[in-house]
């Protein structure tokens, strides 16, 4: 076996672990005025508290940021979060008291989120903002400092008290809302002057029950929703009588079935247009008159034009008949078409 003594001593450097442990370690923070690089001739002194620590490897952004004095330990960080939480709770309590004084606080605002979604009432912007701040602060604390929530019992105290207060407030407000709903149902049965008793849903206007004759009149209009019937009802006050019922009917008769209206549309379309000898679609006219050449018809009688004052003195039907001959003509099949 070969001896490795001389080979090991060739390095000449021996490291003592005890001496390394006794080396002076950094126990204080760098002052805020420390400069990382020399200033240029025209550069100002930096005011930012971003300083680099000696002997530490920069592995995160937090290592560049110097904490404030007295906030370096974990207990002080917990105190920061507890102070923020207390401030948030105080702000929310002030907002709720202001809303209660103004009479603007909704009973379902501070209830549980599931109750709010079931009831369908929107949250008040102020209270929802406070609750959002509380939830965001709790989420931030749980993400950044898990030992604040899961560690010592000192940090759990403010959270438990605030959560219990939140539950108590929600339960009390839910009970008040239930009582108000019960009172609203009792008061909903009202008797309007000159009318029979009817049930009024809470939060809405009461409507007078219609007579049977009026219901019979309105029955066909409900069945045929496509019919052009316009109902105009005038009401005065929260509980008033129906004054007028104006029904404007279209000139064409109303049809009870939609296919009747489609059939009438097809018939009217076929009556409006027809085809000439060349297969082109032209406007159809029911009256078929014998073909006459009316090029010299305007010079009939006294030789005046039909638009002249003398021609206007003639009888109306004859003049209209003359103008129709000037506008229309007949094709080879005898159909009346527009003159081109």
From Swiss-Prot:
Which residues get modified to Phosphoserine?
Answer: 277
Segments passing through the bilayer: none
Question: Which terms in the Gene Ontology molecular function aspect does this entry carry?
Answer: damaged DNA binding
Q: Does the keyword Oxidoreductase apply?
A: no
Asked if DNA damage is a keyword of the record, the answer is yes
The protein's location, in the record's own words, is: Nucleus; Chromosome; Cytoplasm, Cytoskeleton, Microtubule organizing center, Centrosome; Cytoplasm, Cytoskeleton, Spindle pole
Entry coiled-coil feature ranges? none
Where in this protein does the record put region Disordered?
178-209, 293-317
Residue segments, region Interaction with AURKA: 175-340
Q: Which InterPro entries match?
A: AUNIP (IPR029286)
Annotated segments matching region Interaction with RBBP8/CtIP:
266-340
Q: Name one GO biological process term.
A: double-strand break repair via homologous recombination
Q: Which domain of life is it from?
A: Eukaryota
Tell me the keywords, alphabetical order: Chromosome, Cytoplasm, Cytoskeleton, DNA damage, DNA repair, DNA-binding, Nucleus, Phosphoprotein
- Entry GO CC: centrosome; cytoplasm; nucleus; site of DNA damage; spindle pole
Residue ranges annotated as compositionally biased, kind Basic and acidic residues, are: 178-190
Q: Which Pfam families match?
A: AIB
Polar residues: compositionally biased ranges: 296-313
Q: Which PANTHER family match?
A: AURORA KINASE A AND NINEIN-INTERACTING PROTEIN
Q: Which family does it belong to?
A: Belongs to the AUNIP family.
- What do we know about how this protein assembles, alone or with others? Interacts (via C-terminus) with AURKA (via C-terminus). Interacts (via N-terminus) with NIN; this interaction blocks NIN phosphorylation by both AURKA and GSK3B. Identified in a complex with NIN and AURKA. Interacts with RBBP8/CtIP.
Record's function text: DNA-binding protein that accumulates at DNA double-strand breaks (DSBs) following DNA damage and promotes DNA resection and homologous recombination. Serves as a sensor of DNA damage: binds DNA with a strong preference for DNA substrates that mimic structures generated at stalled replication forks, and anchors RBBP8/CtIP to DSB sites to promote DNA end resection and ensuing homologous recombination repair. Inhibits non-homologous end joining (NHEJ). Required for the dynamic movement of AURKA at the centrosomes and spindle apparatus during the cell cycle.
What name is this protein filed under? Aurora kinase A- and ninein-interacting protein
**Can you name the source organism?**
Mus musculus (Mouse)
